[in-house]
Every structure is written in C-alpha cells, then in structure tokens.
C-alpha cells in the first residue's frame, strides 16, 4: 500500500456553477445548521436558506477575481502536494497528497472508502486547528458514514493541532516574516500589498477567528476556549521575539440573527478606533488558507470599517497556505498521528457530547 495523506477542508465553490451545491451541503449539515427543529423541518429549511443566499454570495465571490469561485480548493491542493513532498523529505519514502471537501467538490461523500480509513500509511488531516462540532465533529461523522466506524481514535487521524509547538512556532514566524517583509509573495494570494510593517513591534494585532453560535458553546463546544488558548500561546512566542503591541481576540463571519461568539471583529475595530488606535494588523487564526473570509472579509470589508473608524494603517496578514515552515509543521504533525495510538474519543472530550448519549457512546453515532 502506498503512503497517502488526505487533507480535508470545509470547501468552497470553484466557480459560479458550484455555489448552490456548496451552500446546500453546508446548510443541510445538522452539525453546521444546528437548529432546535425536527429534521423534517430543519433540512428543507437549510436547503431553502442555501438557495436564497446563493445569488448574493455569487456577487461576493465574483469580486475576489477568481472566476466567480473560491480559491480554497486549489489552495488546499497546493498544500497537499507540498506536505507530501515534506513527508518524503522527512521519511525518505514516497507520499501521495490528496484533498476532499465536506461541502461542494471534491465531495467527501463520493470518495472511495480506502482513502477514508486512517492508518499508518493513510493519514487523514482535517485542516482545523481548533475543535468544533461544526467542523471536526461534522467531518468525522461524514467519514463514519463511509467507513462505518468513528475514525478519530485511530492512528492516522490528525486531531486539532492548535497547541502543537511546531504549529505555533510556524504561525509566529509567519506573522514576524509578514511584519518584516520576508515572505515569498509567490506563495500567497493578493500579495501585492505586502510591504512589511514599520515599527511592527508596537502595532495592535487582532487574531480574528470564524465565529460560531453561542448555542454550540452552551452544549459544551470548546472552540472558543481553544481559540483563546491559541492566542495566549502565540502572544507568548511573539513577545519572546520582540513584539510589544497589544493583542486582541475577535470573531467574524456571523450569519443570521442568533447570538454568536463575541466580540465581533467589526465591533473590535470600531472600539479600537474609538480608543484612538491608529495601526492594526489582522491575522485569521482559525484558517489555514486564504479564501472568501480572509481575502474579501478581512482584506476588503473590515479594512473599510477600520478606515471609517479612524484607523489609519491596516494590514491583512495572510493565512499560512504553503508557507514553508507551516508545511513542515503539518508534515510533522501528520507523522505524530501515526506514532502513537490515541484510543480516546476526542469529540466527546472537546465538546461533541450530546445529552441523549449513553455513557461511553461515541457522539459520531448520535
């Protein structure tokens, strides 16, 4: 059997024709569109919401300049190839990099079972640094539908990696290389504006994470806790390297009227402007590749809000993408997953428990 690593991400439409399929997959998922409704109501409602949002979302995708779609799939493919090469360099063996998406294409539901069974020769890497029911648990459940067993406690399944030292150091170095204009622009999208940051040591740094509904936190989801821990660890590493600016944590991409994790990044920028802050950099802490939420939301929409609130200097720090130190970190984290048996239900441990589960029952099978 050949060595393989499968990168799993949420997904994004590659062109306009895939937008509706992407949104339907997203809103039909009971762990994403998590409403206290009977399934016979929730699922059709999710499909209706997806169809209604599709035309508006299409305009936003069009504005990014990638043919009416998202670059996420192509960026994930680049990451898979780069990580496979890094694995070959570390192990001296041949590795094949593959990708699949939980929403849209390439569709994880259509993938051959052999690719979805985690083993020492078949690593499954969900590209989520932090646990959430709406991402990691959703992914594991989709894998289980094909494999007929929960994958998360098996060798070859990569758990959320926000606390990994090699990951943390790679993100610290990415931020510092951005500040000091040392990034290879060819490795990043929309990089024409990358010119370094004067007096970077004292700029205000916002770690902006994708928000989730508070109802998930109330069910025990530890996503917010892991985001906060991630920020604290990065702050420590940055301060050790001479950074002295204030660090802030906020949440973006809220959808719908329900209460989401706070503070919202919009509110954060408004408050910083009100407090007289003039220089801000924003890092997308919950994302590992650039797409709609980083290029358009952080890069354009939030920038306008910052300027409108008196902030004179605004920088979008890119997601890691194929940044070499990040790629090496992911390869090492992947190998760590096959070197020790976890034999524990991380979904339940990290907030995937459901009230109706019996003791010892896996939440994947709820």
Swiss-Prot record:
Name of the encoding gene: hemH
Taxonomy of the source species: Bacteria, Pseudomonadati, Spirochaetota, Spirochaetia, Leptospirales
Record pathway: Porphyrin-containing compound metabolism; protoheme biosynthesis; protoheme from protoporphyrin-IX: step 1/1
Family per similarity comment: Belongs to the ferrochelatase family.
Biological process annotations from GO: heme biosynthetic process
An example molecular function term from Gene Ontology annotations: ferrochelatase activity
Name of the protein this chain belongs to: Ferrochelatase
SUPFAM superfamilies: Chelatase
One GO cellular component term: cytoplasm
């Amino acid at each position: 059997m050949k060595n393989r690593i499968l990168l799993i991400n949420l997904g994004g439409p590659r062109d306009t024709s895939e937008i509706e399929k992407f949104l339907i997959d997203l809103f039909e998922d009971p762990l994403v569109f998590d409403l206290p409704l009977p399934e016979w109501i929730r699922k059709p409602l999710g499909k209706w919401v997806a169809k209604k949002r599709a035309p508006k979302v299409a305009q936003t995708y069009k504005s990014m300049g990638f043919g009416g779609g998202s670059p996420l799939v192509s960026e994930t493919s680049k990451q898979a190839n780069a990580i496979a090469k890094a694995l070959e360099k570390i192990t001296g063996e041949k590795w094949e990099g593959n990708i699949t998406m939980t929403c849209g294409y390439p569709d994880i539901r259509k993938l051959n079972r052999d690719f979805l069974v985690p083993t020492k020769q078949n690593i499954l890497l969900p590209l989520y640094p932090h646990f959430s029911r709406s991402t990691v648990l959703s992914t594991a459940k989709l894998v289980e539908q094909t494999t007929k067993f929960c994958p998360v406690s098996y060798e070859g399944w990569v758990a959320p990696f926000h606390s990994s030292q090699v990951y943390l150091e790679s993100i610290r170095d990415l931020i510092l290389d951005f500040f000091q204009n040392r990034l290879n622009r060819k490795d990043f999208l929309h990089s024409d504006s990358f010119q370094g940051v004067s007096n970077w040591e004292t700029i205000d740094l916002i770690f902006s994470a994708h928000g989730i509904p508070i109802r998930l936190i109330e069910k025990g989801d530890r996503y917010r806790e892991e985001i906060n821990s991630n920020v604290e660890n990065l702050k420590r590493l940055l301060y050790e390297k001479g950074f002295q600016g204030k660090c802030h944590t906020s949440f973006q991409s809220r959808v719908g009227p329900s209460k989401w994790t706070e503070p919202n990044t919009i509110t954060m920028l408004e408050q910083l402007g009100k407090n007289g802050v003039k220089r801000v950099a924003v890092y997308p802490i919950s994302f590992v590749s650039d797409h709609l939420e980083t290029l358009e939301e952080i890069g354009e929409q939030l920038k306008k809000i910052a300027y409108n609130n008196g902030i004179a200097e605004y920088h979008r720090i890119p997601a890691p993408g194929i940044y070499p130190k990040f790629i090496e970190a992911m390869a090492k984290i992947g190998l760590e997953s096959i070197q020790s048996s976890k034999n524990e239900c991380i979904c339940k441990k990290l907030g995937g428990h459901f009230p109706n589960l019996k003791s010892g029952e896996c939440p994947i099978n709820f």
